[in-house]
Amino acid sequence: ISLGLVGSEMCIRDRHCAVHQSTRGKDQGSISKITLTCSGGPFYNLPKNKFKEITIQRALKHPIWQMGKKITIDSSTLMNKALEIIEAKYLFNIDSEKIDTIIHPEGLVHSFVEFSDGTILASMANPDMKIPISYGLGFPKSISSVSKKIDLQTLKKLTFHKINRRKFPSIDFAYFALNHGRGMPI
């Protein structure tokens, strides 16, 4: 789907669509940082020394999303987030040092875009793939979505946590691949 990014197509992923919506019409040079969020998966609160007890059935129970088996396992290990970091670098033509990721257990904020003036735009929506799909299909217009809207009046909290990279080394794999040349991410 052509969205006027670096290439002629855009990956229809919730995080990348969220970034695109926040950066659309903005000067690319004014972007200081892109932050992609993740729920932390089913093992966010599990100590690393308990990882050996993880079963496939447990790994397939994502706390937010209902997905296929492979992407659910990739999400459980944060490998999916590592792939999204690599994709963001090429989709938005941004240095890897300007891409960050953070755990957001509620799954309502999909990305943050920080600009050089200190402004940060957050893209929020309920976790539902109908939203980025309708965005891609309707671009540049917005299509009314059948997805449940967030009621800000009843929203109690939004929490964010730094990713423990010793527990989830896939994030470091992404940066290693990006910093070692264009072919390395393949």
Where are these regions (language model features)?
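Fold-independent oxyanion-binding glycine-rich loops
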Residues: 13-15, 22-23, 34-40, 75-76, ...
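Single conserved hydrophobic/aromatic residue that forms the stacking wall/gate
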Residues: 1-7, 11-12
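Rossmann-like dinucleotide-binding domain that binds NAD(P)(H)
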Residues: 66-108
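Alpha-helical scaffold segments in soluble metabolic enzymes
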Residues: 18-22, 33, 84-91, 136, ...
